[in-house]
Swiss-Prot record:
Protein name according to UniProt: Small ribosomal subunit protein uS8m
Subunit structure: Component of the mitochondrial small ribosomal subunit (mt-SSU). Mature N.crassa 74S mitochondrial ribosomes consist of a small (37S) and a large (54S) subunit. The 37S small subunit contains a 16S ribosomal RNA (16S mt-rRNA) and 32 different proteins. The 54S large subunit contains a 23S rRNA (23S mt-rRNA) and 42 different proteins.
Matching InterPro entries: Ribosomal_uS8, Ribosomal_uS8_sf
Keywords: Mitochondrion, Ribonucleoprotein, Ribosomal protein
Compartment(s): Mitochondrion
Single GO MF annotation: structural constituent of ribosome
Family to which the UniProt record says this protein belongs: Belongs to the universal ribosomal protein uS8 family.
GO terms (BP aspect): translation
Pfam families documented for this protein: Ribosomal_S8
GO cellular component: mitochondrial small ribosomal subunit; mitochondrion
Keyword Transferase: no
Database matches in PANTHER family: 40S RIBOSOMAL PROTEIN S15A (PTHR11758)
């Protein structure tokens, strides 16, 4: 997995959330899409749409049909991510990458189980209320509780508050 892409995505989404943006764009890569879908399943972001360099209109977000990706337009394709807010506060407050290009952090099932229950394991602190930890497994990007439920370990990507 492109760890540098994941750290850039974490930084970009955190900055967009702090700037109170409703819609932001990311490069359309399979790693960014996998993490964005996991964040959407966890309820941190409201929508994900593939598109071009210009954002789709808010009314067309639900019925928007993006043009297919070809070798001629692959460099201009973007993921348009809708951010969520609750009582004037961003739902996505902090996105902290755990694995870095200089240090890849992998976790076994036992370590993930400890972290999910709130205890530290290795480089990872235990999860507190309202936090999620995302793990890249052979079954895709999963939240740590899903990974424990499916009994798989993997590369720890980021912690979200």
């Amino acid at each position: 997995m492109g760890i540098q892409q994941i750290t850039n995505m974490c930084s970009h989404l955190q900055n967009a959330s702090r700037a109170r943006l409703g819609l932001t764009s990311l490069p359309n890569t399979k790693y960014n899409l996998a993490l964005a879908l996991a964040l959407h399943r966890a309820g941190f972001i409201s929508s994900i749409t593939r598109g071009g360099p210009h954002p789709p209109t808010p009314e067309a977000l639900m019925t928007y049909e993006p043009e297919p990706v070809t070798s001629a337009n692959v460099a201009t394709r973007r993921l348009w991510v809708g951010l969520k807010y609750w009582n004037e506060e961003p739902v996505l407050k902090e996105l902290k990458p755990i694995s870095k290009p200089s240090r890849l952090v992998t976790a076994s099932l036992e370590q993930l189980n400890r972290v999910a229950r709130g205890f530290p394991a290795g480089y990872m602190k235990g999860l507190q209320l309202g936090e999620c930890l995302f793990v890249n497994t052979d079954r895709g990007v999963l939240e740590v509780r899903e990974a424990v439920e499916r009994k798989v370990g993997g590369l720890v990507l980021c912690k979200v508050k």
